[in-house]
Amino acid sequence: MRLTPRALCSAAQAAWRENFPLCGRDVARWFPGHMAKGLKKMQSSLKLVDCIIEVHDARIPLSGRNPLFQETLGLKPHLLVLNKMDLADLTEQQKIMQHLEGEGLKNVIFTNCVKDENVKQIIPMVTELIGRSHRYHRKENLEYCIMVIGVPNVGKSSLINSLRRQHLRKGKATRVGGEPGITRAVMSKIQVSERPLMFLLDTPGVLAPRIESVETGLKLALCGTVLDHLVGEETMADYLLYTLNKHQRFGYVQHYGLGSACDNVERVLKSVAVKLGKTQKVKVLTGTGNVNIIQPNYPAAARDFLQTFRRGLLGSVMLDLDVLRGHPPAETLP
């Protein structure tokens, strides 16, 4: 989403921050290490699996994937599904594909599982991958079993439901949520196709025990892979504002009816709070007694800013643009 020429000219003259303060952020606290159990369950189910579908958010195609997936599940045929393509700026999609191919990922597809975009291509791709593999200990089995993996809240359950709509004309088989942690355990097999006979195993989202950088952690948080309060809604809103301005994505100005683009998160959230009526009464002690004043509810405004971004109402965004252009994520952890 772009500004009018006049507003864009004003925005271009603004002095955007060149970097975001990352020192002292406690990333370990954002990503609690209770997910190892889920990974162990996946490993124990591998002997039943013919292929692995890894689902990830298309807004962060080059960062935030769990490296343990490749290490522990890497012997099986693998398809990377970059979901939520409708929310991602895919202007440089070809470069993204080339970058991933350089990492050894040749089987990649972009999808929008809510609207079933490109989902019909998945089963033929998986069938071809399985056909080229040895299917250790499973040659006598006529049905295909696929494990769906990924970090939390990238659309694994949405993918399963979309495949069922496309190939079985059936409704939901697995619950979908807008926050991480909806799928709690490795579930029983869910049928998604008759010909070929194919079942999927839904799995809980599993984050890496160690995130590569603070900035990668913030990107994952913006995409909803952790509960917002663990990172802090206002911190996330500030990083979102910094990112939108840096990449000249000024849809927030139009959406909230702001006079111009702004790099001060307090001012932006104040305007959002006033526009949406998100204010609160606060008692202030003065020399003449208590006085009630109306203040903006900054946390509520930050939550709205984040949710509006996640619904795509601020325009499509590519959070990995810097990585794509050869700049490593900031504050890489030792």
Swiss-Prot record:
Instruction: Give the molecular function GO annotations.
Output: GTP binding; GTPase activity
Record-listed GTP binding positions = N83, K84, M85, D86, N153, V154, G155, K156, S157, S158, G205
**Compartment list:** Mitochondrion inner membrane
The annotated topology with respect to the bilayer is:
Peripheral membrane protein
One of the record's GO cellular component terms: mitochondrial matrix
Protein name, per record: Mitochondrial ribosome-associated GTPase 1
Q: Which InterPro entries match?
A: G_CP_dom, GTP-bd, GTP-bd_ortho_bundle_sf, GTP-bd_ribosome_bgen, GTPase_MTG1, P-loop_NTPase
Query: Organism source for this protein?
Result: Homo sapiens
Which intervals hold domain CP-type G? Answer: 36-209
